[in-house]
């Protein structure tokens, strides 16, 4: 299984890290980021481990999420590709998530490579 990140997800993880560094310090931000990476890496062995994200799933696309509080990691699985679409803060209004433009046709890149 290959994990790919949408451009939006790459941007968001950078913002999450910057915010965490400013608010909680570099060590806490690094630990949180590493926790996210480990959780995502577990998907390689069991890509369907995440719960279905019913706010986004429709007849054509199934989206799942992993919870790393306070974020949902929204992803999809197609063939042998696990695609990370976005990081959703759980305190945000879920109505916004329903209408959020998931990058179904957006360029993707492996995490850390642009």
List PLM regions with ranges.
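A short, surface-exposed loop/turn module that caps and links secondary-structure elements
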Residues: 41-67
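Enriched for short, Lys/Arg-rich terminal
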Residues: 68-71, 76-114
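Arg/Lys-rich, positively charged N-terminal/basic patches that mediate binding to nucleic acids
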Residues: 1-35
């Amino acid at each position: 299984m290959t994990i790919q990140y949408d451009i939006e997800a790459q941007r968001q993880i950078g913002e999450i890290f910057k915010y965490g560094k400013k608010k909680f310090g570099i060590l806490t931000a690094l630990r949180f980021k590493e926790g996210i990476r480990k959780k995502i890496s577990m998907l390689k062995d069991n890509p369907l481990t995440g719960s279905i994200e019913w706010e986004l799933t429709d007849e054509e696309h199934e989206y799942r999420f992993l919870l790393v509080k306070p974020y949902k990691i929204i992803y999809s699985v197609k063939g042998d590709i696990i695609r990370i679409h976005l990081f959703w803060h759980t305190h945000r209004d879920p109505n916004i998530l329903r209408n959020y433009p998931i990058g179904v046709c957006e360029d993707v890149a492996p995490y850390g490579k642009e």
